[in-house]
Each structure stands twice: as structure tokens, then as C-alpha cells.
UniProtKB/Swiss-Prot annotation:
N-terminal signal peptide: none
UniProt-listed InterPro entries: Memb_transporter_dom
Protein name, entry field: Uncharacterized protein Cgl2769/cg3067
Major localization class: membrane
Organism ancestry: Bacteria, Bacillati, Actinomycetota, Actinomycetes, Mycobacteriales
Length: 389
């Protein structure tokens, strides 16, 4: 089912609150939920049945903390977390058993934990987890009868299980990244739709509302980068995902163009606000160009949301042809005798066409060559669309 056209405010509201997106969020986290449940259960079982510890609280807790990590370098950060948590628990248990609990004991435990962590590793995660582990022992758990080693072993067990689950039961390296690409392109499409409608109606207020809502879109861009980093690491660590490396590289390749689309759309929208507030206008041709790139961005968003390779193979060439046609139409003549704001809107429209072509698979050089030249000595020889082709 194709995505429907929405204004910027409605699009961002849908991303945050709609039942469909809530269900998608639950579906996207199902694997994490399963991983966490399995990791906690396995860590607890190993600590109780294999190591014979009576109350291995830190085994399942460490596993869940490790599996909750997101973004790139999960294995490295998981190792740092495991080391910090285990050493903090061990140090706290050892010290509290000797000096008891109280306010000055907390001072000693945290201070020594941070000193030891600074010596062991430069990573902030190690320092934080050592301090937190020591505080937990000092404030919530009395020292164990068996000394400091049992709880420290439990923490190592949980961390080790978490790392193994990350490596052996990986999540899809593509689904989260493609979903975030779809979100960002959907937001860009809504912004451009609002711009085109506002330029027609000379409605600066609507554009200001869209820009205010658009400030929240950076979270989607950040999630895109996080998802792509996670996917890249997953295909490096897990042998089950080595076959997806090429597709993850393709996803990584479009990160910059996707980010540029939303950035250029923001600049275009801000300039459209200035233009409408000044009671100036753009040509009908410019509005047509903005409407077209908005529709193409929405189509791309829909493709990435549903990730059907057959659909992509059929639709991407069609979208490229539409963009090539637009590239031949965005010459200086459609903003001739217009104010500076109209010229800036034209320049941003040209930039977004290049970004969308790169998302469709073209190199930047080939994408720029699609544009009708605005210079007597263009850096890349033009490859303009011919209606007779």
C-alpha cells in the first residue's frame, strides 16, 4: 500500500503517535525482546546450574544491559561494559565486606572504583560501570558469604552471554536502516509538499508551523546513522550475515544523500518563508518542480518502507527518468527576473534532485551532469534528458 501524502506536522505526528507506527515499533523491537529474554534466562541458568551460585542477580542483569546497547561498535562497548560491571561488583563486594556500609564508605568505594577504572581502561563506560557496580553493592546488596568473587563471576557470565547472543543471534542488518531511510524521505516529501502548497497560497504561517515541527526530525536522522552502524557491525561479527555485506554497503552509501535531502529541504523551506513574508513569488514552473521532487521522495520512502526488490527494480528506473526530466527543466530561466529568494529555492531544488538521483544509485558526478548547466564551464559535461529518447 503506497504512502499517502501528508503535511509536515501530520507526518511527524504519525511517526510519533499513530497506531500503525506504534505496532511497527513493537515489531521492530521483537527480536531485541527475544534476545534479552533468552540472554537473561541463559545467564541465570549458567550461574545457578553450572557454576552453582545461589542468587546470581548480576548474571541476568548484565546480559540485559549488554543486549540493550545500540549503534556501532556494540562488541567493543559490550566488552567495556562487562569489564566495568564485573570489576565494580568485585571491588565493591571486597571493600564493603571489610569496611561496612555508610556515607563515607560510598565515598571510598566510588573513588577507588574510578581510580582503578582509569588505570585499567581509558573507556568512560568502564569507569561508569565500575562506579555503578560498587554503589549497588554498597547500598542494596550486603556482601556475599563467599567473598567478592561470586558476584563478579556472575557479572562476567551475563556479559559473556550477552556478547554471544549479539554475535550468534543477530538482528537483520537492513530492516531498521531501511525503515529510518523511509521515515526521513517521508518527512522531506511532506516538507516539500507544504512548500509547494504554501507558495501557491502565499501562506507563510503554514510554512512556519512546518518548520517548527521539522526541528524534531533530527532524531530520525540520528536513528538512521545508528541503524546503519549496527547493520555494518552485524555483518562483520556474525557469519550468518556475511551474505548481506553488499546490501549494507549500499545502505551506507546513501546515508549522506538522504541526510542532504532533509537538510536541503529545510533550507528551501526557510527561504520559502522569507519569500512569502516579503510578498514575492516564484514561477509556476518552480512550484511544479517542487511538487515533482516531493512526489518522487514519497515514492522512494514507500519503496524503502516495504523493501521489495522486485518493486525497486521496476520503479527506480522510472524515478530516475523523472528526475532526469526535471534536471533538464531547472535552468536559470524558470527563475529569471525573480528575487534572490526565488533563485535560492531554485538552487536548493537542483541540489535535492542530485541527492535523490544518488539515492537511486547514481554517482554524484553523473547526478550533477543531469542538471541543465548554469555555468559556461560546468565541472561535469551535461547529460540532459531528451524527450525523444
Amino acid at each position: 500500500m503506497a504512502k499517502k501524502k501528508l503535511g509536515t506536522v501530520a507526518r511527524l505526528s504519525e511517526l510519533d503517535k499513530s497506531l500503525r507506527n506504534r505496532l511497527l515499533r513493537v515489531r521492530s523491537r521483537l527480536l531485541f525482546i527475544v534476545h534479552s529474554a533468552i540472554g537473561a534466562g541463559v545467564a541465570y541458568w549458567i550461574a545457578v546450574e553450572v557454576i552453582k551460585h545461589g542468587q546470581p542477580f548480576f548474571a541476568p542483569m548484565s546480559a540485559v544491559i549488554i543486549l540493550g546497547l545500540s549503534g556501532g561498535d556494540r562488541i567493543k562497548r559490550a566488552t567495556e561494559l562487562t569489564l566495568g560491571c564485573a570489576l565494580g561488583v568485585g571491588l565493591g563486594d571486597l571493600l564493603i565486606m571489610q569496611i561496612g556500609t555508610g556515607y563515607w564508605q560510598i565515598f571510598v568505594v566510588v573513588g577507588l572504583a574510578l581510580l582503578v577504572a582509569s588505570f585499567v581502561s581509558p573507556a568512560p563506560l568502564v569507569s561508569n560501570q565500575m562506579a555503578i557496580g560498587g554503589i549497588l553493592i554498597a547500598t542494596m546488596f550486603p556482601p556475599g558469604d563467599g567473598g567478592s568473587i561470586d558476584r563478579m563471576i556472575d557479572a562476567f557470565i551475563g556479559g559473556g552471554v550477552g556478547i554471544l547472543v549479539i554475535a550468534l543471534l543477530p538482528s537483520s542488518p537492513l530492516d531498521a536502516g531501511r525503515h529510518q531511510v523511509a521515515n526521513v524521505l517521508g518527512i522531506a516529501a511532506s516538507v516539500l509538499e507544504d512548500v509547494a502548497a504554501s507558495l501557491k497560497a502565499k501562506d507563510a504561517a503554514k510554512l512556519n508551523n512546518a518548520l517548527e515541527a521539522l526541528r524534531r526530525s533530527q532524531a530520525s536522522v540520528n536513528k538512521l546513522e545508528t541503524a546503519a552502524s549496527s547493520g555494518k557491525e552485524a555483518t562483520t561479527v556474525s557469519p550468518f550475515l556475511w551474505g548481506d555485506r553488499a546490501r549494507v554497503r549500499s545502505l551506507y552509501r546513501i546515508l549522506a544523500p538522504v541526510d542532504n535531502v532533509i537538510r536541503n529541504a529545510r533550507v528551501l523551506a526557510r527561504r520559502a518563508v522569507v519569500l512569502t513574508e516579503d510578498n514575492d513569488t516564484v514561477s509556476d514552473e518552480q512550484i511544479h518542480v517542487i511538487e515533482e521532487i516531493a512526489d518522487i521522495a514519497l515514492r522512494l520512502s514507500d519503496l524503502y518502507e516495504h523493501h521489495k526488490e522486485i518493486s525497486e527494480a521496476l520503479e527506480i528506473p522510472e524515478l530516475v527518468n523523472r528526475l532526469r526530466q526535471l534536471g533538464s527543466e531547472v535552468g536559470e530561466d524558470i527563475a529569471e527576473d525573480r528575487v534572490l529568494s526565488a533563485q535560492v529555492i531554485l538552487a536548493q531544488s537542483r541540489s535535492i534532485i542530485v541527492d535523490l538521483l544518488q539515492i537511486c544509485g547514481m554517482s554524484r558526478e553523473s547526478a550533477v551532469a543531469v542538471l541543465v548547466p548554469t555555468s559556461e564551464s560546468p565541472a561535469y559535461p551535461p547529460e540532459l534528458w531528451d524527450d525523444e529518447d
